[in-house]
Amino acid sequence: MNLNKHSERKFDLITVGRACIDLNAVEYNRPMEETMTFSKYVGGSPANIAIGTAKLGLKVGFIGKISADQHGRFIEKYMRDLSINTDGMVKDTEGRKVGLAFTEIKSPDECSILMYRENVADLYLTPEEISEDYIKEARVLLISGTALAQSPSREAVLKAVSLARKNDVAIAFELDYRPYTWTNTEETAVYYSLVAEQADVIIGTRDEFDMMENQVGGKNEATKAHLFQHQAEIVVIKHGVEGSFAYTKAGETFQAKAYKTKVLKTFGAGDSYASAFLYGLFSGESIETALKYGSAAASIVVSKHSSSDAMPTADEIKALIAQAE
């Protein structure tokens, strides 16, 4: 798939959805009840992907609603310092807060996240706050699945998708399923399918595609066959330690292994994967190489304490691949 058309546009990528605060446990190998210190980072899948792609050298913008308080200002400054354009970032005027995620690291295999997302600002982004003039400056618009979980954010995202299609902006859909935000699985399947059928690139885990299909034990062949009846050009399905697969509408199949690393935590891998995979496509690399970039970036992030701060550079990604091969 060619992401290099419209090179005259201001942004390579605009991401849409939540930006929140991650509070990651500094003390490892102990439960939350015994953890006393945390480090603060910017979090939220679309914010992390904006950060990851910006660190890789892409021109990036962000659309989302944040709190008008200290946490909101922290998020905005952090992203601006990475040269991420925040003209699409809206401040909530009704006292809503950004989400908080406390992470627990009992062991590399036993990590959990304690979420505080009641009445959060990001889910109150409205359709009126979506600018066509902003979206049409992008080559790709990335949608995060969690932004579809509630109204009015849901309608804002659907408007953004419609404007992207109208203005020949390619759509990438990162499924980003978070069960704590959704009312029921039927609702998830409906809205995921609405966006997936309009997306050019769809990225998710096998379990996330099962949520979209409202089933258990789905098969990649059936998933790609359905999506290729619609807009999709590339479908990426991740299988954890078994690696990941990319399928194209032209009938090609590619596979990348998961790179071995010393795992510190299990979260953050998906956002770094999406960032590096898209970077590979923007760089004109083959899909096979883009898959390797995604897998390598995920391996790097799970070996480090944060998600956003740990997003790797292109040199770090290429060095890991070269070392492994």
Swiss-Prot record:
One of its GO terms (biological process) is inositol catabolic process. The keyword Membrane does not apply. It catalyses: 5-dehydro-2-deoxy-D-gluconate + ATP = 6-phospho-5-dehydro-2-deoxy-D-gluconate + ADP + H(+). It is an enzyme of class 2 (transferase). One of its GO terms (molecular function) is 5-dehydro-2-deoxygluconokinase activity. Its EC number is 2.7.1.92. Pathway: Polyol metabolism; myo-inositol degradation into acetyl-CoA; acetyl-CoA from myo-inositol: step 5/7. Keywords: ATP-binding, Kinase, Nucleotide-binding, Transferase. CDD domains: KdgK. Gene3D superfamilies: 3.40.1190.20, putative 5-dehydro-2- deoxygluconokinase. Catalyzes the phosphorylation of 5-dehydro-2-deoxy-D-gluconate (2-deoxy-5-keto-D-gluconate or DKG) to 6-phospho-5-dehydro-2-deoxy-D-gluconate (DKGP). NCBIfam families: myo_inos_iolC_N. Belongs to the carbohydrate kinase PfkB family. This is 5-dehydro-2-deoxygluconokinase. It comes from Listeria monocytogenes serotype 4a (strain HCC23). The lineage of its organism: Bacteria, Bacillati, Bacillota, Bacilli, Bacillales.
